């Protein structure tokens, strides 16, 4: 039987643990993402995402097809809209990390959405060709400061701790696992101490013996993470943004040198 795909057709959609809107949100899909359909139940589809994460998504939030969506451009602004080509009627909102099939035109881009509808946007679209540096990763990470915490979130509408880290690295075409414990396990051969961490390395924290939180290292003991909202805090007890709870829960850090090369 030919493989079927669920092409996400809204800027951000929740993916649930069960085929029920009342069940837990486990993660999110972003506009343009093509998910592999592995099962269905009524109006719901069980899908696998690019990072191996699976869950249930409602039929109204995407297109079921035997082809992946031909996206060639990424949204690099925090928000935007797609309007009908013939007017100002908004047909889709946009957020950072959405991917679209589009081409440049004067003052913006013409786009074809996953359902085939055509529109126009002035939102900044492009391809990430910049080779990531530790500085560029931190610059991007800081641009999300203030975004609220959202369990399962992986967009500027709301991030959870690991969704924040995954989004930052995926922007530079570097794919990380979805959850904090998976990220920790992925880099288990690259563990370092808190003091050895450079900016853009990862700090991991445990609760009850299990890894439950991740943060992005900066210099001099500072770090960025999503807890309540995306913020900068410190391991230094003399700093005004010292987080004593996380320092007590600190497990270890990992170097990102294996994927950054620096």
Regions from the language model: what does each represent?
Residues 127, 150-158, 190:
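Short, surface-exposed loop/turn motifs that are enriched in glycine and acidic residues
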Residues 64, 127, 190-191, 218-262:
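Aromatic- and glycine-rich peptidoglycan recognition patches
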């Amino acid at each position: 039987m030919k493989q079927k795909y669920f092409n996400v057709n809204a800027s951000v959609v929740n993916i649930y643990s069960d085929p029920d809107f009342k069940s837990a949100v486990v993660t999110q899909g972003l506009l343009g993402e093509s998910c592999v359909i592995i099962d269905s139940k009524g109006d719901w589809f069980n899908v696998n995402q690019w990072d191996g994460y699976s869950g249930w998504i409602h039929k109204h939030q995407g297109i079921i097809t035997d082809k992946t969506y031909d996206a060639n451009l990424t949204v690099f602004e925090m928000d935007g809209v797609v309007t009908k080509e013939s007017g100002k009627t908004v047909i889709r909102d946009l957020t950072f990390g959405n991917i679209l099939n589009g081409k440049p035109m004067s003052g913006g881009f013409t786009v074809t959405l996953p359902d085939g509808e055509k529109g126009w946007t002035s939102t900044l679209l492009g391809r990430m060709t910049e080779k990531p540096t530790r500085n560029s990763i931190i610059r991007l990470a800081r641009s999300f400061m203030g975004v609220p915490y959202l369990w399962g979130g992986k967009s500027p509408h709301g991030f959870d701790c690991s969704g924040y880290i995954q989004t930052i690295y995926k922007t530079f075409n570097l794919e990380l696992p979805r959850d904090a414990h998976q990220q920790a396990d992925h880099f288990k051969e690259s563990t370092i101490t808190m003091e050895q961490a450079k900016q853009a390395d990862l700090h991991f924290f445990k609760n009850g013996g299990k890894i439950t939180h991740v943060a992005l290292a900066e210099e001099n003991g500072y770090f960025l993470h999503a807890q309540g909202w995306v913020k900068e805090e410190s391991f230094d007890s003399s700093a005004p943004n010292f987080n004593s709870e996380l320092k007590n829960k600190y497990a270890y850090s990992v170097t990102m040198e294996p994927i950054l090369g620096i």
